[in-house]
Every structure is written in C-alpha cells, then in structure tokens.
C-alpha cells in the first residue's frame, strides 16, 4: 500500500482530500481511493505508476474514455477518480468530481481545436499523439509501430483465463487503443481455442461490413489525383486493404478512423459471444443466506455487464434487482437506507451480515425483546394468582397431597366413599364423599346437621298403651337412635354413647 499511497504527497494530498465525490455531498476523496484506482488499473493490465504524473493520467483517460458508453459503474468510477487526480497534478482548482470532468472536457475540446487549426495551417495531419501506434519518424513520415508481444500475451492470457466473461470486452478495448485493422486482426488470430466464438465474431463483422457498404455507396467517376479512395467494408476489416492504406485513411485530412470503426464491430461481436458464454440472466442472481453482500454485488455487476441493454435500462436493473434479490437480512437493512443510498453506503451497512457477530447481535436483540415482553406482562399482572392450590383427598386439608398425609388412610374411594375401587376408576359423577363416606350435601332430604326424619306425632307414645311390658333404658336408647338416625348411626363409630347411659 505504501507504493500506491505515494502517488500524492504534501500540498497535493491536501487538495485531493478537499475535493468532494459529489456536488454538495459530504464525502470527500481519501487516500484509499488512490489505492483502489491502482488495483483496478492492474486488473486492466495498465501500469499503476502512470497515476504519479499528469501525462500518465492523460494516457489513462485516453484509454478509458472509449469504453465509458458500454462500461460498468466501476469503470466510470475509475475514470472519475483519474480525472480528478489529473486536475490535482495540473493544479486546477476543482470542488468536486463534476467540475473535474468539465475541466477535462474543456481541455480536450481546446486540444482538438488546436490540432485542427495546425492541420489546416500546415496542410498535413501531424497528430502524432492522437494516432498511436502510428508515429512520426525522424524524416517526418507517418509509420506504423507494430503491436508488442507483451500486449498480445496479455490478451491471450485474458481469453484463456476468463473464457469470454464480461470483463474481456473492456480489456480488449484497453489493449487495442489506437490500433489499425491489421493490429486488431493480429490480436484475433492469436486466440487459439474458442473457434466457435471466433466464427460467430466473423459473421458479425461480415454483417457490419455489408451494412457499411449499403450506407456508403461508391461514388461514380474516377478518383481525383492526390486523393485516396473511400474504404469499403472489407477494407475496414483489413482483408482488402494494405497497411499503408490503413495508415493513410487514419492520418488523412479529414481522417477516416478505420481502426476505431473495426474495433467497434469487434466489440459488438464480443458482446454477443459474452452473452452466449454467460447464459445467466440478471433475474437469476440472488444472494445466498450466508453469502457476504460484497460477493453478491460482484456477481450481480459481472452478470449486468453481459446484459445487452442500454445504460438507462442497466441503471434501472441495478436500482430494482440489487435490493430485491438480496437475502432477508440484507434486504431489511437496504430498505431502511432508502432508495437514494449509494453502493458504498449499502456495502458498509451490510458488512458482516451472515457472520458470527451479526448472528450474535440478532440473537441478543431477540432475547432482549422476549425479556421486555415478559417484564411487561408481569407488570400488567398477567401472572397473578397463577399458583395452584393443593388439597389433600385423604383428610381434606390444604397444603399437602394425600401421598404425604399423616392422618390414617381413608378406606374406599375418595370420591364416592364406596369400597372396591379407587378414585381414578370411579364412575360416579356426583360430589366427593364426606368423612362419613356419604355424599354431601345430599340433593335429597335435609342437610346432614339436621334430623334426617322427624315424624309428626298423631297419638300418644306406644309405651303408654303397653301396660305390663317393661323396657330397659338401653333398648329405649336404641329405639330412639334408629328413629333419629336411620341413615347413619354414631353408635357404629363410637360405641355406646356415655351421655345416654
């Protein structure tokens, strides 16, 4: 990181950190943005040391600008960062990224006007820096500098490793900057495998060449001396034109950029190949339950690159499906951020979702909610008087059960008072038996503390009419007991009543 961070130092670093990312925004550029730009340039096989000078930044901008229309959001962010860094190197005062882009556009327009004016004054197109790899030698002649083996090796390695994934297109655009049709054919011929894809590319090129011939018919009559013939579709593709003719068209006044036209046809064919090699639709990209949000975003934008749609449609897809296809945890966070949240804010908010710390935090919140609800219910008195009252079936007292009762065990059923079965097998649906073994209170007759039967006397007692018969006191008492207590006799429980003797 130290080498990357040494791009700016001192006063330039202070200027860099004062520039805002967006107009009237809160976030400003930091050192980490330079580190990120260096890593992105390494991905595109561009030397990151070019960021250290203004001329190097200008070269990077020249390579990235043609791919802005079809590039991803990361490519646009890289272009914006390099443009802002160029203004810092040139000591151009800017307040935000938009002002830096406006300054770059003004400078490019001025340089184009100067080049056109110089070409009109001198009568030749000596725009050396605009037409690399076509350079001017010491004799003032425009010559072609062949594409380097290092560039070809980088292109072949990308095709072998990526196999026409979406990032192949910006890589091809960067490596073929300013190339002639002959250079482009050399790059295509170095691809050994994937011949089916190469055949599809040839068909696309032939279709575009036929469309060019239809839109640019040949003018009748001879060609004026000193003028070049107009290129046909096959000339642009490099099959019926020589290298000198290609250089002549590209350096003529006005120039015909046959290299850029052919490059555009190739990129159109590569888009079709990428679509074939990446059959996954953007609708199928969904975040897994344990997948980090960063990996999900990488897969999303990689698939979005392969979509054959305009930039407006891609922006709508990003705003809609990026949040909609996230997992429930991330979706809850993203919806809370609102629709105006930036990608950086989304990734920061969803950082760590699905990991151990996030799960522990969710569990703690759930436990806190349960504890709070339980406390509220206790405060409301929902658990008041919930304790069950225990009563003994043996003695009838409260506070213990029959198993722990110290009183003598009552015989028979505790419910109906009859012997021969237990209470659990009792079929009597009445009330529980009292200590006498009888059901009380009885639904028939008088209460237990009243005399059960008391016949009204209609004549004098019987003994008054029995003259000569004597009855003992014990017989008299038994007779009284039977009359007073026909259902239950206390004598059976306590023997003879002493009070009656």
Swiss-Prot record:
Region (Disordered): which ranges? 106-128, 444-482
**Motif Nuclear export signal mapped to chain:** 16-22
| PTM description | Gag-Pol polyprotein: Specific enzymatic cleavages by the viral protease yield mature proteins.
Q: Which SUPFAM superfamilies match?
A: Retroviral matrix proteins (SSF47836), Retrovirus capsid dimerization domain-like (SSF47353), Retrovirus capsid protein, N-terminal core domain (SSF47943), Retrovirus zinc finger-like domains (SSF57756)
Q: Where is this region: Interaction with host AP3D1?
A: 12-19
Please state the residue ranges covered by CCHC-type zinc fingers: 390-407, 411-428
Identify the residue span(s) of motif PTAP/PSAP motif: 457-460
Q: What GO biological process terms are annotated to this protein in UniProt?
A: viral budding via host ESCRT complex; viral translational frameshifting
Which parts of the sequence form the motif LYPX(n)L motif?
Answer: 484-493
Which parts of this chain are annotated as the region PPIA/CYPA-binding loop? 217-225
Annotated region (Interaction with host CALM1) at: 8-43
Segments carrying motif Nuclear localization signal: 26-32
Where does the record place the modification Phosphoserine?
A: 148
Lipid-substituted positions (N-myristoyl glycine): 2
Recorded hits in Pfam families, A to Z, give: Gag_p17, Gag_p24, Gag_p24_C, Gag_p6, zf-CCHC
Q: What does the further note read?
A: HIV-1 lineages are divided in three main groups, M (for Major), O (for Outlier), and N (for New, or Non-M, Non-O). The vast majority of strains found worldwide belong to the group M. Group O seems to be endemic to and largely confined to Cameroon and neighboring countries in West Central Africa, where these viruses represent a small minority of HIV-1 strains. The group N is represented by a limited number of isolates from Cameroonian persons. The group M is further subdivided in 9 clades or subtypes (A to D, F to H, J and K).
Write out the similarity annotation.
Answer: Belongs to the primate lentivirus group gag polyprotein family.
Q: Which PANTHER family match?
A: ENDOGENOUS RETROVIRUS GROUP K MEMBER 24 GAG POLYPROTEIN-RELATED, IGE-BINDING PROTEIN
About its domains, the entry says: Late-budding domains (L domains) are short sequence motifs essential for viral particle budding. They recruit proteins of the host ESCRT machinery (Endosomal Sorting Complex Required for Transport) or ESCRT-associated proteins. p6-gag contains two L domains: a PTAP/PSAP motif, which interacts with the UEV domain of TSG101 and a LYPX(n)L motif which interacts with PDCD6IP/AIP1.
Q: What is this protein called?
A: Gag polyprotein
Species of the source: Human immunodeficiency virus type 1 group M subtype B (isolate RF/HAT3)
